Amino acid sequence: MRAVLISGSYKGLSIPKEIIQFINKYIKSNKVISFIASDFEDYEGNKKFVNKLVDLFKEQSITFKKVYIIDSLKTKPETHSNLKESNLVFLLGGDTLKQIEYINKFSLKELIKKEDKIVLGISAGAINLGTKVVLAKDESDNIPELSMYEGIGVTNINVEPHCEFRNQKHFKELEEASLYSPILLMNDDCFIIVENDKYSYYGSYIILDKKNTYFNNKECTLEDFLSEIKYD
């Protein structure tokens, strides 16, 4: 399986060169991409976000033969046809629970994780690439309670993209969630490249496991981590 999990924010709004090199390594030409929305009814928002991402790829000399947006403007058979044709699939950010609901409704999981594709997920999309997703309560992000569900099954890790480390209320919810599964808390600069079960980590992150925090494979306090990465 080949995948990229992206936290969701980059200074200067550029796609890291490691991600570009990874894509070009496996798909040298005739790139066809399907963008999977988080809100299948937000047609204008989806189009705007996709156009921005296509421009960012173009700045890095990646162009696409075809670009598809997977949302409710298309029938279920049309979404399946688009995904079968695509060698790149990009799950957009937004409402995490709403996105997995639509993915299940349109029966997209098996098509997303075909071995011949590179799958990218940003923010909510990165979360939903997991196998057994454990999602901490976050009412500000439309997650009213701790949620556990079957993800798409592309990766075997749980992530918390662009984590607000100094939000003590939400961090306590993350600690509770970590009792059920380790969670990788991603800073804005963090992304993960998955290549045939090998995970390569870029940027700064910590692991939260049973309320304990780990940085560079060593147990640490949250403040030690924030001091190390100069978190503002």
Which role fits each region the language model picked out?
Residues 14-78, 82:
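ATP/NTP phosphate-donor binding region
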Residues 98-102, 108-165:
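Class I SAM-dependent methyltransferase SAM-binding "motif I" and its flanking Rossmann-like core
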Residues 31, 87, 156:
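Conserved acidic residues
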Residues 5, 88-92, 120-121, 159:
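Structural motif
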Residues 35, 120-122, 184-186:
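A structural signal for short, well-ordered beta-strand segments and their strand-loop junctions
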Residues 2-28, 40, 44-51, 135-232:
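C-terminal and late-domain segments of enzyme folds
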Residues 65, 69-118:
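Flexible gly/pro-rich beta->alpha loop and the following alpha-helix that scaffold active-site loops
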